[in-house]
Regions:
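Extracytoplasmic loops and strand-loop junctions of Gram-negative outer membrane beta-barrel proteins
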Residues: 12-15, 69-76, 129-137, 148, ...
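Membrane-proximal, glycine/serine-rich, low-complexity loop/turn segments characteristic
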Residues: 1-118, 140-173, 216-232, 277, ...
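Outer-membrane beta-barrel translocator domains and adjoining extracellular loop/strand segments
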Residues: 54-70, 115-125, 130-132, 176-185, ...
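Outer membrane beta-barrel strand-and-loop segments of large Gram-negative receptors
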Residues: 76, 201, 210-214, 254-261, ...
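Face-selective signature of the C-terminal outer-membrane beta-barrel domain
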Residues: 87-111, 136-300, 386-387, 425-448
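C-terminal beta-barrel architecture of Gram-negative outer-membrane proteins
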Residues: 454, 466-516, 539-540, 544
Length: 587
């Protein structure tokens, strides 16, 4: 909510930003705001377009029972992806009284993408002598429309101490995706040796809806005690139609495949929570409990629906001690839940190419994590230092399963899907520090080290035992009063996963910004991945087959942006955001 001096209006404000990058990337946006009396209006519009090359390999090596090479499949990928979209947001705040504010937030997104790739295959025998050569042509076109609206009201008796709020939010997402695949035989020299065959059209029509209703109440019980409580209802509905046609001979005779199917998924979560906070001298204490009752069901065409009901309790607690204004020690415990995402539940195959396919699992259960954390921080004249060791125990952990010997309709593929494993334990520490030397240098550094042990349980052979680490650096210097130089770097060491190993990842960004007309205008140049180090590589398989997959996603680019602002943009009440879900599937 906007906080203004009495009888002060911000009036009209606006802004414009635009930018482009090499190669073939462009974005532009504008915003307009108005505040007068009880009314606050703010709207934005943006358009972005991105065209980049994607190159990589998928090389497969098969072994005989004795462990000797049996055959090779080498795949080189040359692709290009084009993404573009329009974004619009509109926000209205209306002060009904000095203590009551009615707010509405609307967001619209229209997007489309075209993803094309040529994958060249070379088949070799055990001695790497030539056997066959062919090309798979893949073309994917996708369209999407997102509607999101939130209506809320807030009654404030004492800011941040005694408040009552309620919100209703609805999200609707429609996606249409069509993929065309062809196989073209080639001679050893790469020339065509015949007409294209094995044509395939995969069409997916998806509708996702989510309705959220919640109310939150905060009030002081005493001068040092505060109670927070609330209720939340969430409904999620997924509907997907998957239609597959095949032309095996390339003669125009398209036949519907048995892969065609329909999928419906419904989920409802009823939740309530209470948090009690108490201050005692230099200690701040907090204890909370959230209860959830959930039910869900999914249906596939021709199969009986499978319902699933569960209830959960999520206790939490925090003890914080401040021996001085410059130091703090905090101990915390919380129980968390991660529900499977939309793509993780989608059971229809999504082909990256003829050899690699992603398949979701609608039978996934949510995973639960008990997190214990200790945080110690110290702030001084020239910066701060924070050490945060942690331990996390997760049950029904959702992990990726890479199967290099899978088949889809008789075709040998490498499939990527998900399944629940029995448990996972991880422990490690985060070390973060900042250095402040005035305008000439402000720096930040972070280091993370952790070990994760995953046990698939008696029903699964999947397991992992890995140690990895990462660090990030950020430095900013004011070259002149109007020129700022900023650089950041990230590195993550290699890490083992179930049935595979991810190689290291590193990335650099450098930005030079120049202010014009005070703070009203600026121009910037950003170099993304200037050293071309952003590279993805994973090795996966078993004793019978090993696959190496590597990609460069065209991250490297030079961006030039211009920004202009007029007036003072009003502050608006944004919709409440859910806690971000942990992403434990891929490192």
């Amino acid at each position: 909510n906007i906080v203004l001096k009495a009888n002060t209006d911000l009036g009209l404000s606006g802004g414009l930003n635009t930018g482009f990058a090499t190669p073939s990337r462009f974005n532009t946006g504008t915003n307009l705001g108005y505040q007068s009396g009880p009314v606050t209006l703010f709207g934005t519009y943006g358009y972005n377009a991105d065209d980049r090359a994607i190159v990589g390999i998928n090389d497969r090596l098969r072994y005989d029972p004795a462990g000797s090479p049996l055959s090779y499949t080498n795949q080189d990928i040359d692709g290009r992806t084009i993404n573009a979209g329009h974004n619009f947001t509109g926000n209205i705040d209306y002060k009904l009284t000095d203590k009551d504010v009615l707010s509405n937030s609307l967001s619209l997104n229209r997007r489309h993408s075209n993803d094309g790739a040529l994958a060249g295959y070379t088949e070799l025998d055990a001695t790497q002598a030539f056997l066959d050569r062919y090309v798979i042509d893949r073309n994917d076109k996708a369209r999407g429309l997102v509607f999101d609206n939130s209506l809320s009201i807030k009654h404030t008796i004492e800011p941040r101490k005694h408040e009552l709020s309620a919100e209703v939010r609805f999200n609707r997402t429609r996606d249409e995706d069509n993929t065309l695949l062809w196989r073209e035989p080639q001679n050893p020299d790469g020339t065509s040796s015949g007409p294209s065959t094995q044509g395939e059209i995969d069409g997916t029509s998806a509708l996702t809806r989510q309705l959220t209703m919640q109310t939150d109440y905060t009030r002081p019980l005493t001068a040092s005690t505060k109670l927070e409580s609330g209720l939340k209802e969430t409904g999620r509905w997924l509907d997907r139609d998957f239609l597959v046609f095949k032309d095996d001979l390339g003669n125009g005779n398209w036949v519907q495949s048995n892969l065609s199917n329909k999928f419906q998924f419904d989920e409802h979560v009823h939740a309530g929570y209470g948090v009690l906070s108490q201050s005692v001298g230099k200690f701040d204490l907090q204890a909370g409990l959230r209860a959830e009752w959930a039910n869900r069901s999914f249906d596939l065409a021709g199969a009986q629906g499978i319902p699933y009901n569960y209830h959960s309790l999520f206790p939490s607690g925090v003890i914080m001690y401040k021996p001085s204004d410059q130091s703090q020690v905090k101990v915390s415990y919380s129980r968390r839940i991660r529900r499977p995402g939309t793509q993780e539940l989608n059971p229809f195959p999504v082909f990256f190419d003829q050899q690699n396919v992603f398949i979701g699992n609608p039978r996934l259960n949510p995973e639960y994590t008990d997190a214990f954390e200790l945080s110690m921080s110290k702030t001084g004249q020239f910066g701060s230092l924070q050490l945060s060791p942690f331990y996390r125990h997760t049950t029904d952990v959702i992990r990726v399963n890479i199967n290099t010997a899978d088949t889809v309709e008789g075709r040998e593929v490498t499939s990527i899907n998900f399944q629940n494993l029995d448990k996972s334990d991880s422990w490690g520490t985060d070390l973060n520090g900042s250095l402040r030397l005035g305008p000439k240098l402000n720096a930040f550094g972070g280091f993370n080290l952790f070990k994760m042990v995953t046990d698939g349980g008696s029903q699964s052979a999947l397991s992992s035992n890995a140690v990895t680490w990462s660090y990030r650096l950020n430095a900013t210097t004011q070259v002149t009063p109007t020129v700022t130089l900023q650089a950041n770097y990230f590195y993550r060491a290699p890490v083992n996963i179930e049935k595979g190993r991810f190689s290291s990842i590193q990335m650099t960004n450098i930005t030079l910004r120049k202010k014009l007309d005070g703070d009203n205008m600026s121009v910037a140049v950003r170099f993304a991945d200037p050293f071309n180090t952003m590279y993805f590589k994973v090795k996966a398989g078993d004793d019978n087959l090993q696959q190496i997959t590597a990609r460069r996603f065209g991250v490297r680019a030079t961006y030039v942006t211009f920004q202009w602002n007029y007036g003072q943009a009003p502050k608006i009440r944004l919709p409440q955001q859910d806690q971000p879900q942990p992403t434990s599937v891929f490192p």
